[in-house]
């Protein structure tokens, strides 16, 4: 048994069945896709009830798709006629899919789930770490008479797996969250505080997260015509470390550089700030602030007026 388990773990997969990992609603179109690294002449597929192991649907394949490299086989599996609530898997020859659900509640909670990533990426106080990072951001770069002076731009979100921060991505994320709330206010729950820690505060969690973004954007646009579009640069890329233990050296202790919009390429040698547009950055500020002003008009009129 142990030998068989080891051999099965070592076997190289060469065919896969891709499904909607969230699942399918009962009356929705239900499609899976078979892909293989070898040319296969697939005629049919089966849908298996995961609990009983019984076949609940067996169907001939009517649509053969053009495979995309490196695959040599691709088939579209339509099982839309299956409408019974349950957990299933699909089998095609020796290939089988992960289990998936068919139910009208498969998308419940997904809007809130996406906010988990945003809370994880927070700069300043990070609720995942229950600690703070980059609390001395930052010092002005390309600021004319203000060059090298301190400016408070704490907050916002780290952009990716590194700790750089950009208006371009942050303003877009803020706008999208505000837009989602505008269109579907009842889709979001209240399970987290403004700090990102668990708790209820009477506000949808998406509003707390978008407010985190708006507060930071206001710091990055502190006065008319004064816009900053980036914190830190490629000197950040010194390997993995937690944000509250960041040792990247920008020459001013724990402060990081804050790049002012000038319309020109900025930075030295490979430490380039590649954002050269002013109008593009201004537009992103404007869209986030305009949507925020509309959303907060009835929630926090004073904050709405600040954004307008």
Please name every model-derived segment.
Residues 4-14:
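Bacterial Sec-dependent signal peptides at the C-terminal "C-region" and cleavage site
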Residues 77-80, 158-168, 195-215, 271-280:
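Aromatic- and glycine-enriched glycan-recognition loops and surfaces
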Residues 16-104:
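Ligand-binding face of N-terminal immunoglobulin V-set domains in extracellular IgSF glycoproteins
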Residues 92, 163, 174-197, 215-223, ...:
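Well-ordered alpha-helical scaffold segments within catalytic/enzyme domains
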Residues 63-81, 129-184, 264-271:
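Active-site-adjacent substrate/metal-binding segments within catalytic domains
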Residues 27, 97-132:
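Low-complexity, Pro/Ser/Thr- and charge-rich linker/hinge segments at domain boundaries
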Residues 152-160, 228-308:
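Active-site lining segments of carbohydrate-active enzymes
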Residues 205-231:
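Carboxylate/His-rich catalytic cores and anion/metal-binding grooves
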């Amino acid at each position: 048994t142990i030998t068989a388990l080891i051999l099965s773990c070592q076997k190289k997969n060469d065919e896969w069945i891709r499904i909607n990992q969230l699942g399918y609603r009962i009356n929705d179109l239900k499609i899976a896709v078979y892909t293989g690294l070898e040319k296969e002449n697939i005629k049919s597929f089966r849908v298996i009830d995961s609990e009983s192991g019984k076949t609940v649907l067996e169907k001939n394949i009517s649509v053969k798709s053009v495979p995309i490299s490196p695959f040599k086989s691709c088939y579209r599996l339509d099982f839309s006629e299956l409408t019974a609530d349950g957990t299933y898997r699909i089998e095609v020859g020796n290939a089988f899919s992960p289990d998936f659900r068919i139910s009208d509640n498969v998308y419940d909670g997904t809007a809130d789930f996406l906010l988990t990533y945003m809370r994880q990426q927070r700069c300043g106080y990070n609720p995942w770490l229950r600690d703070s990072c980059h609390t001395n951001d930052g010092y002005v770069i390309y600021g004319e008479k203000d060059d090298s002076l301190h400016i408070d731009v704490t907050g916002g979100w780290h952009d990716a797996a590194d700790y750089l921060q950009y208006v371009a991505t942050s303003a877009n994320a803020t706008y999208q969250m505000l837009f989602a709330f505008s269109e579907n206010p009842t889709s979001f729950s209240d399970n987290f505080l403004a700090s990102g820690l668990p708790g209820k505060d009477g506000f949808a969690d998406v509003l707390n997260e978008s407010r985190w973004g708006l507060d930071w954007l206001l710091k990055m646009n502190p006065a008319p015509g004064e816009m900053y579009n980036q914190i830190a640069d490629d000197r950040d890329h010194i390997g993995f470390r937690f944000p509250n233990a960041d040792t990247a050296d920008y020459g001013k202790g724990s402060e990081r550089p804050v790049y002012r919009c000038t319309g020109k390429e900025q930075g030295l040698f490979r430490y380039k700030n590649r954002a050269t547009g002013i109008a593009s950055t201004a537009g992103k500020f404007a869209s986030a602030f305009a949507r925020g002003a509309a959303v907060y008009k009835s929630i926090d009129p004073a904050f709405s007026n600040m954004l307008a």
